[in-house]
Amino acid sequence: MKNIQKILPLYFVAGTQDCRHLGENLSENLLFVLKQALEGGITCFQFRDKGKFSLEHTPSAQKALAINCRDLCREYGVPFIVDDNVDLALEIEADGIHVGQSDMPVQEIRAKTDKPLIIGWSVNRLDEAKIGENLAEIDYFGIGPIFPTQSKENPKPTLGMAFIQTLRNAGITKPLVAIGGVKLAHVKTLREFGADGVAVITAITHADNVQAATKALREASDEYAK
């Protein structure tokens, strides 16, 4: 059985669009940041490469980058998750896939492979969580956005940190990772409210020292581990 809680304490999400401030070589930018984040102690990485500043419109380059990211994660023993793109995830044998409410149904994803694929599901409302709680195919929920975020186009309404507590009080038992504008100062409260971890983008990609920032986030999350 997969120990999902073990991979959620510090869940890093990124694509080339999140690293364009580092220079023109989009692929190298992401690989550089990812390596530093792995050195700093991330417990999971989600390849989320989408939008007009990404490699979304050059699939061959995007696939090559995804494979490089996967291989780098494997060097560190860190799970590699693909966002939304089920075909890519299966083709390159990613460790998991993360999908939203309007993406491919989780039952269909699970039916596509007999391998122990990790499946994450985005949740923005209590009723969504209650539905997902009863779906055995789902391994964890990505709850957000907790705070306003510029990393996602047309984000859903912000939830606030107390929403994690609301879910736990409502009987939601699946592993939860909080995402959306999460910073170091929020980690303690989110963990205390019942999150199994935090998912971050800019808290790592825009850090002056990626490895040090990652280490601080990991230590803060581990300090309040259950």
Swiss-Prot record:
2-[(2R,5Z)-2-carboxy-4-methylthiazol-5(2H)-ylidene]ethyl phosphate binds at residues 149-151, 181, 201-202. GO terms for cellular component: cytoplasm. InterPro entries: Aldolase_TIM, ThiamineP_synth_sf, ThiamineP_synth_TenI, TMP_synthase. It holds the Pfam family TMP-TENI. The keyword DNA repair does not apply. Its cofactor is Mg(2+). Binds 1 Mg(2+) ion per subunit. It comes from the Bacteria. Mg(2+) binds at residues 84, 103. Keywords: Magnesium, Metal-binding, Thiamine biosynthesis, Transferase. Signal peptide: none annotated. One of its GO terms (molecular function) is magnesium ion binding. It catalyses: 2-[(2R,5Z)-2-carboxy-4-methylthiazol-5(2H)-ylidene]ethyl phosphate + 4-amino-2-methyl-5-(diphosphooxymethyl)pyrimidine + 2 H(+) = thiamine phosphate + CO2 + diphosphate; 2-(2-carboxy-4-methylthiazol-5-yl)ethyl phosphate + 4-amino-2-methyl-5-(diphosphooxymethyl)pyrimidine + 2 H(+) = thiamine phosphate + CO2 + diphosphate; 4-methyl-5-(2-phosphooxyethyl)-thiazole + 4-amino-2-methyl-5-(diphosphooxymethyl)pyrimidine + H(+) = thiamine phosphate + diphosphate. NCBIfam families: thiE (TIGR00693). Condenses 4-methyl-5-(beta-hydroxyethyl)thiazole monophosphate (THZ-P) and 2-methyl-4-amino-5-hydroxymethyl pyrimidine pyrophosphate (HMP-PP) to form thiamine monophosphate (TMP). Belongs to the thiamine-phosphate synthase family. PANTHER family: THIAMINE-PHOSPHATE PYROPHOSPHORYLASE, THIAMINE-PHOSPHATE SYNTHASE. This is Thiamine-phosphate synthase. It comes from Haemophilus influenzae (strain ATCC 51907 / DSM 11121 / KW20 / Rd).
